[in-house]
């Protein structure tokens, strides 16, 4: 009897491990909006859904770092669903207050940009498997807004 249960367990584990899962990538991080309080950047995330039905996204969590310091983090609850058998583009807004940017003066230096690392966690609700988080990471540099961008 225990051999039968062990075989059944191995079968289920093998099938669950080989289930197709959505794949995601960060395609771009750009300046989105400048206000008097903060600079808002937008991360464009491309997510492909291999299933023939839409899948709900539970949440998107993000951590925006520069010079080894966290400069913005947050969670976007219930951002929508992934389209069935298609690629969905998600826009993740990241708001960075000016006082944080001022503290990064050494990194900004002469080239007027921020070297960043963006870590995203895209949590989706897969049938049978349950909540599944796709970890994403993107490194790059973003130009800071000039006075002409603000006014």
Swiss-Prot record:
<dbReference type="InterPro" id="IPR004864">
    <property type="entry name" value="LEA_2"/>
</dbReference>
<dbReference type="Pfam" id="PF03168">
    <property type="entry name" value="LEA_2"/>
</dbReference>
<dbReference type="InterPro" id="IPR013990">
    <property type="entry name" value="WHy-dom"/>
</dbReference>
<keyword id="KW-0346">Stress response</keyword>
<protein>
    <recommendedName>
        <fullName>Late embryogenesis abundant protein Lea14-A</fullName>
    </recommendedName>
</protein>
<dbReference type="GO" id="GO:0009269">
    <property type="term" value="P:response to desiccation"/>
</dbReference>
<comment type="similarity">
    <text>Belongs to the LEA type 2 family.</text>
</comment>
<dbReference type="InterPro" id="IPR045043">
    <property type="entry name" value="Lea14-like"/>
</dbReference>
């Amino acid at each position: 009897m225990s051999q039968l249960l062990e075989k059944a367990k191995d079968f289920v584990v093998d099938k669950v491990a080989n289930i197709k899962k959505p794949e995601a990538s960060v395609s771009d991080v750009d300046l989105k909006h400048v206000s008097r309080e903060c600079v808002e950047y937008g991360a464009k995330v491309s997510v492909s859904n291999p299933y023939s039905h839409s899948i709900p996204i539970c949440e998107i969590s993000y951590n925006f770092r520069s010079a080894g310091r966290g400069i913005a983090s947050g969670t976007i609850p219930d951002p929508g669903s992934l389209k069935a058998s298609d690629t969905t583009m998600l826009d993740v807004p990241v708001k960075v207050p000016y006082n944080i940017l001022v503290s990064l003066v050494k990194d900004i230096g002469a080239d007027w940009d921020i070297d960043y690392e963006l870590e995203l966690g895209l949590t989706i609700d897969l049938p049978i498997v349950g909540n599944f988080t796709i970890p994403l990471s993107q490194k790059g540099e973003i130009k800071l807004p000039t006075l002409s961008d603000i006014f």
